[in-house]
Amino acid sequence: IHSLRRNIDINILLFNNEIYGLTKGQFSPTSKKGIKTKSNPHGTTDEPFSPSDLAIGAQASFFARVVDTDPKLMQRIFIDAEEHRGTSLIEILQNCVIFNDKTFASITAKEVKQNSQLFLEDGKPMLFGEEMNKGIILNGFKLKVVTVGENNIKKEDILIHNAKEEDPTLHAMLARMRPPEFPAALGIIRAVRRPTFDEGIIRQLKYEKENAKFKTVDELLRSGDTWQVKS
């Protein structure tokens, strides 16, 4: 949280498999409500934690999401994250075949992925589907899936992704989308430019030095009322 809000120039990879696999299958903060595990055999009553909500709520300057079955997309996003100045957070939807197999099947399964994945590209319309004719529009204050060519919907009606938008409202809405009602948003959801932590510190130190009353420690010691102690 503090890395994100301070915008320290680092890259963070968050592997989300919705389970604690390394500790033999305990439920995790991102586990779906009701999941049964060794540490909670009757099902968890906790609401799942959202990495995207945390990132955007902490004013992250870069947030992206990929799936572990798409190495080409991961490579592209990793490069973009490395080139970004500030903290980048990439959520990797990862399958745990031992303790939580197929947890993201509704997004990654071969037979559904074309209709359940929306790859976001800055400046391009939010289109998806086998024929790339499904899209996202704003219906009042909510997102809605539509089909181009139906109900007088034209391609021009589809939202254009703007990852550089300072206001995170739409970014948060996109990040929350999940099947079956919506496709899951993949790619770079948010990428805004703001000063990094070290840039802010350096700028502050430079200003204080330039405007300091005393330029050296010697000037400080010789300022004001002074006296000598003689033996």
Go through the PLM ranges and name each one:
Residues 1-21, 73-76:
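Thiamine diphosphate
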Residues 29-81:
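Conserved thiamine diphosphate
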Residues 11-16, 91-93, 189-191:
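Short beta-strand segments
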Residues 98-231:
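Flexible, low-complexity linker and terminal segments
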Residues 5-11, 15, 59-60, 84-87, ...:
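Short coil/turn connectors at secondary-structure junctions
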Residues 18-33:
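Glycine-rich anion/phosphate-binding loop at the beta-strand->alpha-helix junction
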Residues 61-117:
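ATP/pyrophosphate-binding catalytic subdomain of soluble kinases
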Residues 3, 28-32, 81, 106-109:
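Short, hinge-like loop/turn segments at secondary-structure boundaries
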